[in-house]
């Protein structure tokens, strides 16, 4: 008897519906082999929700997500909503969704596919074999700390204020996710901070060091964030799992992303302590190519694979999808963002068809 999973599907804006269709087809194709069944429940978020009901995260969408086993999100946003007040913009809907689901840990892998070594701006010998994971704290730090704002001083001068703060509980929570993630990978965890000048980073380092006693099988190291950024570009193969705060993780995960050469190959997962996790590609909604069958669906498909591995505990099914992607790339098929001499250009739908063909072998 098949195991049925209820999946909230948030196709979103721009290329979102196109890449979502491919990911769902891939999941349907692989389901019978692993005794799985999916109940896909569509819901609105972002610009399409604003157009439909006047707000970026309808209450019905949050309710649907909370009642699901996992949430699969494509992309949100577009220039037509940029002039709206901040609280009505698509991006606010995503922040509210993360908050509403209690998601505090963001996992972003950066893995180099051998077939795409040429796509990176770094030398092949520098990036060949890179396979790392950035674990970023999502709900604390300087993006959420209070007080914040732009104030006028007694002398009439404007002063901008943001507060970077973490509690020991918040640090321990993300630290445990990072140690558990590293334990399932190569057993190496690098904690990134700025403990030489920031008290909040001193606490971060102290808490991670204390936690390491519970994970003797994981090797813990520490780097200052400026050095970590340099090392990611100089010698990225030294890293396995990186854990860091919200701001530093925002920056470092984008650096790690470009090691791969294409943001169109990067999935992500956002996890909470309980309840459904959120899985989405790193790239945006790319409205300039929406509806033209030019989008690269592979980051979305890899997000579906992450959902299987981290959200539904189906690692074998996840691996099968990843192996299908490798096989299709081995055969020389590329979407436009990955195209190089000697390869065969395919569109979004055809890339999906090739994956399904590979999965049916």
Swiss-Prot record:
Functional description taken from the UniProt entry: Catalyzes the oxidation of 3-carboxy-2-hydroxy-4-methylpentanoate (3-isopropylmalate) to 3-carboxy-4-methyl-2-oxopentanoate. The product decarboxylates to 4-methyl-2 oxopentanoate.
Protein's name in the database: 3-isopropylmalate dehydrogenase
Species the sequence originates in: Thermosynechococcus vestitus (strain NIES-2133 / IAM M-273 / BP-1)
Similarity annotation: Belongs to the isocitrate and isopropylmalate dehydrogenases family. LeuB type 1 subfamily.
Cofactor: Mg(2+); Mn(2+)
Catalysed reaction equations from the record: (2R,3S)-3-isopropylmalate + NAD(+) = 4-methyl-2-oxopentanoate + CO2 + NADH
Binding site for Mg(2+): 226, 250, 254
EC top class, as a word: oxidoreductase
Primary subcellular site in the record, as a coarse category: cytoplasm
């Amino acid at each position: 008897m098949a195991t049925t999973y209820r999946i909230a599907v948030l196709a979103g804006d721009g290329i979102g519906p196109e890449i979502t269709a491919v990911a769902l087809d891939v999941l349907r194709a692989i389901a019978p082999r692993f005794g799985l069944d999916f109940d896909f429940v569509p819901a609105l978020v972002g610009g399409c929700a604003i157009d439909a009901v006047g707000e970026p995260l309808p209450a019905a969408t949050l309710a649907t997500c909370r009642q699901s086993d996992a949430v699969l999100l494509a992309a949100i946003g577009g220039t037509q909503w940029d002039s709206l007040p901040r609280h009505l913009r698509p991006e606010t809907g995503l922040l509210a969704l993360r908050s509403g689901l209690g998601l505090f840990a963001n996992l972003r892998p950066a893995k180099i596919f051998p077939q795409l070594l040429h796509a990176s701006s770094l030398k092949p010998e520098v990036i060949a074999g890179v396979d790392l994971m950035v674990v970023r704290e999502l709900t604390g730090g300087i993006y959420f700390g209070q007080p914040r704002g732009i104030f006028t001083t007694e002398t009439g001068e404007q002063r901008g204020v943001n507060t970077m703060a973490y509690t020991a509980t918040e640090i321990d929570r993300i630290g445990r996710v990072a140690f558990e993630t590293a334990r399932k990978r190569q057993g190496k965890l690098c904690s990134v901070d700025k403990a030489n000048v920031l008290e909040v980073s001193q606490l971060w380092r102290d808490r991670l060091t204390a936690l390491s006693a519970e994970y003797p099988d994981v090797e813990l190291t520490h780097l200052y964030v400026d050095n970590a950024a340099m090392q990611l570009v100089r010698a990225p193969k030294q890293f396995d799992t990186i854990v860091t705060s919200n701001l530093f993780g925002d920056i470092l995960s984008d650096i790690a992303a470009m090691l791969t050469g294409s943001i169109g190959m990067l999935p992500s997962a956002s996890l909470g302590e309980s309840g459904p996790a959120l899985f989405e590609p790193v790239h945006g909604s790319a409205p300039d190519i929406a509806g033209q069958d030019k989008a690269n669906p592979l980051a979305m498909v890899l997000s579906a694979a992450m959902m299987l591995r981290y959200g539904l505990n189906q690692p074998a099914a996840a691996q099968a999808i990843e192996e299908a992607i490798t096989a299709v790339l081995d055969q020389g098929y590329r979407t436009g963002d990955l195209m190089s001499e000697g390869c065969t250009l395919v569109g979004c739908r055809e890339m999906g068809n090739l994956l399904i063909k590979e999965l049916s072998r």
